[in-house]
């Protein structure tokens, strides 16, 4: 039974009438452009065929009832006429409540909803299960009540909910790609203007995500340190963000900067340039150049931004040794563990899976998780 069938069946069973709509919003993987988003730079993610699915129907009152199929059918119920506050014990409820609360501040022309939620985006793997949930909930209200909100506004609403209601400081990329993803395409996103450009993916190429299953510990504190170092760099150049600094300007005065800050700045500037070039390499179907850019990105994250760990580097090396110049591989996400992403010709996927299975656990003592994905459509009815 797929997620649509599962949520529709549970909806009818619990609520006693059929759902009128089923909505999906996908998770995502970032192909290149790491730690560039909060520097007003460029990112190149694609939506993946793992998603949050919600079967739903409008109510004729002001109550919102929610069932979380993946949490033993836990229930949340709240009124649109009372202040929406955080739930004491159910963290998943806060994503739903936060989205609804922030929607009310944007456009209050909606009533109650019944919904059943289920998803298969792996949690804690850096594939944006939370953004997928936020965008799915926003799309439910937009579709059921014909709200005049576009995908970018639904994405911004989700980001606001996560920043202000849930209390997690995230950029806009995850929600934007979940809302605006396009089948068989990646999306070049300008994180300053929120402008997007669809980039077609070469035919016969698989998007492979491998979770190192190395438990991330430093990610919060180190992430904040990196942001501060980038802001220090921007101040040195008297610019609002590193987006506004050229590599030439940096190279001319790099020796005057604190050496650690200089390394951080060099990563962001070079990564921005790589990301824009990667979009054009992908569009031309030049997988060899894309592979070189991904390798440079990984080396920059490892040596200049210093956010990889030995387990991640090992995983990247195993994949690279298997695919040679026929594809690309790099760490993806915030760093200090998490996942790697690889673009691999479909006929090489079994060889990569076998090499990783034989070598990674033997070298690190940890068993990986392997996902083969397709670039998928953003949020909407399913």
UniProtKB/Swiss-Prot annotation:
<feature type="binding site">
    <location>
        <position position="130"/>
    </location>
    <ligand>
        <name>Mg(2+)</name>
    </ligand>
</feature>
<dbReference type="GO" id="GO:0004335">
    <property type="term" value="F:galactokinase activity"/>
</dbReference>
<dbReference type="GO" id="GO:0000287">
    <property type="term" value="F:magnesium ion binding"/>
</dbReference>
<dbReference type="InterPro" id="IPR019741">
    <property type="entry name" value="Galactokinase_CS"/>
</dbReference>
<dbReference type="InterPro" id="IPR013750">
    <property type="entry name" value="GHMP_kinase_C_dom"/>
</dbReference>
<dbReference type="InterPro" id="IPR006204">
    <property type="entry name" value="GHMP_kinase_N_dom"/>
</dbReference>
<keyword id="KW-0418">Kinase</keyword>
<feature type="binding site">
    <location>
        <position position="223"/>
    </location>
    <ligand>
        <name>substrate</name>
    </ligand>
</feature>
<dbReference type="InterPro" id="IPR036554">
    <property type="entry name" value="GHMP_kinase_C_sf"/>
</dbReference>
<comment type="function">
    <text>Catalyzes the transfer of the gamma-phosphate of ATP to D-galactose to form alpha-D-galactose-1-phosphate (Gal-1-P).</text>
</comment>
<protein>
    <recommendedName>
        <fullName>Galactokinase</fullName>
        <ecNumber>2.7.1.6</ecNumber>
    </recommendedName>
</protein>
<feature type="active site" description="Proton acceptor">
    <location>
        <position position="174"/>
    </location>
</feature>
<dbReference type="GO" id="GO:0005829">
    <property type="term" value="C:cytosol"/>
</dbReference>
<keyword id="KW-0963">Cytoplasm</keyword>
<keyword id="KW-0479">Metal-binding</keyword>
<feature type="binding site">
    <location>
        <position position="162"/>
    </location>
    <ligand>
        <name>Mg(2+)</name>
    </ligand>
</feature>
<keyword id="KW-0808">Transferase</keyword>
<dbReference type="Pfam" id="PF08544">
    <property type="entry name" value="GHMP_kinases_C"/>
</dbReference>
<dbReference type="GO" id="GO:0005524">
    <property type="term" value="F:ATP binding"/>
</dbReference>
<comment type="similarity">
    <text>Belongs to the GHMP kinase family. GalK subfamily.</text>
</comment>
<dbReference type="Pfam" id="PF00288">
    <property type="entry name" value="GHMP_kinases_N"/>
</dbReference>
<keyword id="KW-0547">Nucleotide-binding</keyword>
<comment type="pathway">
    <text>Carbohydrate metabolism; galactose metabolism.</text>
</comment>
<feature type="binding site">
    <location>
        <begin position="34"/>
        <end position="37"/>
    </location>
    <ligand>
        <name>substrate</name>
    </ligand>
</feature>
<dbReference type="InterPro" id="IPR019539">
    <property type="entry name" value="GalKase_N"/>
</dbReference>
<feature type="binding site">
    <location>
        <begin position="124"/>
        <end position="130"/>
    </location>
    <ligand>
        <name>ATP</name>
    </ligand>
</feature>
<dbReference type="GO" id="GO:0006012">
    <property type="term" value="P:galactose metabolic process"/>
</dbReference>
<dbReference type="InterPro" id="IPR022963">
    <property type="entry name" value="Galactokinase_bac"/>
</dbReference>
<dbReference type="InterPro" id="IPR014721">
    <property type="entry name" value="Ribsml_uS5_D2-typ_fold_subgr"/>
</dbReference>
<keyword id="KW-0299">Galactose metabolism</keyword>
<keyword id="KW-0460">Magnesium</keyword>
<dbReference type="InterPro" id="IPR006206">
    <property type="entry name" value="Mevalonate/galactokinase"/>
</dbReference>
<dbReference type="Pfam" id="PF10509">
    <property type="entry name" value="GalKase_gal_bdg"/>
</dbReference>
<dbReference type="InterPro" id="IPR000705">
    <property type="entry name" value="Galactokinase"/>
</dbReference>
<dbReference type="InterPro" id="IPR006203">
    <property type="entry name" value="GHMP_knse_ATP-bd_CS"/>
</dbReference>
<keyword id="KW-0119">Carbohydrate metabolism</keyword>
<keyword id="KW-0067">ATP-binding</keyword>
<dbReference type="InterPro" id="IPR020568">
    <property type="entry name" value="Ribosomal_Su5_D2-typ_SF"/>
</dbReference>
<feature type="site" description="Transition state stabilizer">
    <location>
        <position position="28"/>
    </location>
</feature>
